[in-house]
Amino acid sequence: MSKGHSLQDPYLNTLRKEKVPVSIYLVNGIKLQGSIESFDQFVVLLKNTVSQMVYKHAISTVVPARPVRLPSPSDSEHGDSEPGNA
C-alpha cells in the first residue's frame, strides 16, 4: 500500500470497527449520512437504510459524529489492521 494511505486507512477502519455514525460531504456539496460498512482503495460503502457505494474521488470531507482516537502504530501490529474487513 502506498504511503498516502498511512492515515486514511486506519482512520476509516476505526470508524468502521466502532460503527461511528459519519457525515460524508461530496465535492458537489451533497451530504450523506450513515456508518462505514467497508472500504477499499477506491470506494467507501456507507450504510444507512440502504448501502451506498461512494467513490473516494467524490468525497470532500468525512465528519464523525463523535471524536475518534486513532490507534498508535504499535497497536496495528497486534490487531486486525486489514482495511475494510467487516
UniProtKB/Swiss-Prot annotation:
GO CC annotation terms, alphabetical: cytosol
GO MF term list: RNA binding
Superkingdom, natural source: Bacteria
Basic and acidic residues bias spans: 75-86
Sm domain sequence ranges: 9-68
InterPro entries with a match to the protein in the record: Hfq (IPR005001), LSM_dom_sf (IPR010920), Sm (IPR047575)
Record keyword RNA-binding present: yes
Signal peptide residue numbers: none
SUPFAM superfamilies linked to this entry: Sm-like ribonucleoproteins
Gene3D superfamilies: 2.30.30.100
Pfam family, one: Hfq
Disordered as annotated region, ranges: 66-86
Keywords per UniProt: RNA-binding, Stress response
Gene Ontology biological process terms, A to Z: regulation of DNA-templated transcription; regulation of RNA stability; regulation of translation, ncRNA-mediated
Function, in words: RNA chaperone that binds small regulatory RNA (sRNAs) and mRNAs to facilitate mRNA translational regulation in response to envelope stress, environmental stress and changes in metabolite concentrations. Also binds with high specificity to tRNAs.
Subunit structure, interactors included: Homohexamer.
Similarity comment: family membership: Belongs to the Hfq family.
Name of the protein this chain belongs to: RNA-binding protein Hfq
